[in-house]
Amino acid sequence: MPRGAQAMLEKQADSVWNQLYEICWNFYVKNVWDINTFKAIVDKIEKSDDKQLIRFLIWFNDARKRSNFNDKFQWMTSFLYGRRYPPLGDDLVVKEPWNDLQQLDSIIKYGNEPIDLVKMQPDFTTEERIVQNRRVNNCSLICSLTNAREENQIKSYSVHNVFNVILHFNGSNRLVSVLRDSNFPKCSKDGAALTLFSHNIEDMLIELAYFEIKNNRNYAYGGSNTATDTYLLTGWIPEILNLGDVSFSEIRKCYQFNAMLALGTDSVKGKEVTENHDFVVTSVNWKKEQFTILNPHGTENPTVYTWDDLIKEFKWLYVNWDPYSKYTQRVKLHDRYPDKFNAYPTWTQKPLMCIENKSNSIQNCHLYLERHLLDDSILESNLTIGEIPRSGFTAVSAEGNNSGFCNMQLRLNPHETRLIFYHSDKKCNLTFHLLSNSGLVSMSKCKSDILTAESSWNITNNQWTIGTSEYFKSPVFKLKSDGFDDTYLDFELVSQLPAKVNFQIFESDDYALQRPIFKNDTYSPQIFSKHGVRLLKGREYFIVCSIAHHITSPFIFTLRNPETKQSKFELSPYSLGFGGLRYNEVLRCKTRITISVSNFTRLFVLLFTSASKTNGRLTLRLYEKETEEILFEQIETRYDLSVKPFPIPNIELKPASYVLEIFYNADVVICNLGTSHRAIFESDL
């Protein structure tokens, strides 16, 4: 075939590849499916002799028919820095890149330093190993690449002038392509190279792909860690262990399965090794408890450390292990974590994951949580995973770090279900990887068994603590239950802003709030909880939520029933100061209030004073004005309305005029008056 004709066919094939890419992208990411466009591309491909193109078409046609949320989520999270990184492995060869590689070749940077972009050749002047360029802060990548090469875990292939490497991020294998003859940076000032040193040009291309993903092709990098970078290169599960918290036998147990090891130092000075630096573990002598360590700087020979010396010099052990050496099953579940989950510092407001063992045998599982990469890298942002307790609000376990991943080991009894909560300091996308040895172990999102009510403290209700006459003005909830037995509940009060908080529970006939069902007037920082509170059957309760300082803040009140036998509960706001009645009035009086009603109505009265101690004789009388029929009368020889409000609850009134007389040793008494229908009140002040 003439050379010109061959070039024309290749150009047409390239065009078909890109058209098929767009159809695929539109289907998964934009949720657009044009059957006519698809049929047209099928006709073109059927006339082609490109086996890879035909294979990709067959794969896509099958995949789209069985696609689910997870599949679409993996494609929707393929976008990074405005570029596409499809969830494809090395088993599905593509002939065209998904991004404009020529344009990418021009955006390489080294911070704000002036650089020249040049073609580079492998470095045959160094030893036959990968060596870090000290001007570039990527010791973790060099350690990871060294280990991955040794374990033959780099997945890559080349087509024409494109080098394709499979990296692992955003919950999937992902295709990253760079030009085989890519430009590389050199310092303009002294001509020094800014790439790693290796006999293999592909190591330099992998470094370029790494910086494309991690730092938008900027070689001025803040650094990472070997566990994270090894996962990026190989997909092997990462773990970071503090050497001070593990024993030599535990490390040996890690190594029983295919594993890659590296070490990291901290910022403590005065040690022999470089601070804040990662090192490769090239071998371990298990009998002598000796580790052979290699510095990625390449200026030192491998050094042998005993276990005792190792824990003195190094801080971190980075372990990456092959998931398929321990487990046969892998299930993934993707999720988004929005800011709203961080409104309150409690797991009760976090999303939950349910891990269930449906088999008849004990199952050992591993849960790995991965945070997705974003254009603006999330630095110093913690990711936390924990297990919800059977009762109460203290997590069974909760481990977190800022590495971008979390791990949890689970041992599930037959037919056991465990609930896991997860947290991120910042909004992000996440992927759960559940590893097990049974297809009967499943993972799903779920809802908690808690009941939550939300309210807020403001200038009208944040000034009265326990023991004050106006304590009832604090936010109040009324709790109802349809249970036929006594029950034990767990309660938690959480302020959104830092503040000292407390709640007390009273039976619903205790309008004066003098008999809490548990006595605890301590105010706790931001969270106040009580476990195993006994509530009697058939009773209703008031829950008063107060704050120690005059702070304006939203809060949540949470109820949890740990018992297997569930009852239904209703938690609703309640205006305790007015008996929960619709119409409210506050009057100041000396000795007399006149009440005029035109409909049958229910009356609630609450008397108190805001003055200092007023302990003395209190006489109350409510009577119909015309007939002088007494509806309520009570005398208290010693009563202090400045501490203990006095309630007159639920008096039924017919249409008429009434008089409420109050004899007390205070200049002014404040009266809260609640009615179910409108009424007219007149005070003698």
Swiss-Prot record:
It comes from the Eukaryota. GO terms for biological process: proteolysis. Its EC number is 3.4.22.-. Residues 82-323 form the Calpain catalytic domain. Transmembrane segments: none annotated. SUPFAM superfamilies: Cysteine proteinases. Keywords: Hydrolase, Protease, Thiol protease. This is Calpain-like protease palB/RIM13. It comes from Kluyveromyces lactis (strain ATCC 8585 / CBS 2359 / DSM 70799 / NBRC 1267 / NRRL Y-1140 / WM37) (Yeast). The gene is RIM13.
